[in-house]
Amino acid sequence: LDPSHLIWQGMDPIQVIRALGGDAIFHVHAKDTKIDPINAPIDGTLDYRPYGDEIHRSWIFRSIGYGHDELFWKDFVSQLRLVGYDYVLSIEHEDSLMSKNEGLVKACDVLKRAITFEDKMTKARWM
């Protein structure tokens, strides 16, 4: 599951996770996409421009937190856990606006706050 591709296609990764369910998700990429608010409404998101022409593209891949905010990523990992996926998130860096090292550090910063690391509570105390 790669949310960055779902985003540029106009899909909602949170809803896709719920629709697929945990049985259909075997690996998850942690990569973001920023839809350009000036170019996308004019050109759509099926962009034909070279990836290096960022200023004219309708979207570009971004590091985690630079296309969508931290709340989105908290919702993303929570939905994965809700459907039963509790495994690897592979950070994939294709952000042309920052170095690989900086992109990795910034992605890790956001994901550390978004991911829950302890076992989930399986039964509510009132049940």
Feature-to-residue mapping (PLM):
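A general structural motif
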Residues: 22-25, 82-88
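Short, flexible loop/turn segments with low-complexity composition
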Residues: 92-93, 119-127
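Conserved, mostly hydrophobic/aromatic
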Residues: 2, 28, 80, 89, ...
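A short, acidic, flexible beta-alpha connecting loop/helix-capping segment that sits on the rim
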Residues: 90-100
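A structural motif corresponding to the C-terminal end of an alpha-helix
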Residues: 75-86, 117-118
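A conserved mid-domain beta-alpha-beta active-site/ligand-binding segment of alpha/beta enzyme cores
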Residues: 72
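C-terminal helical cap(s) of enzyme catalytic domains, especially alpha/beta-barrels
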Residues: 100-120
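Acidic/histidine-rich catalytic cores of soluble enzymes
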Residues: 1-66, 122-126
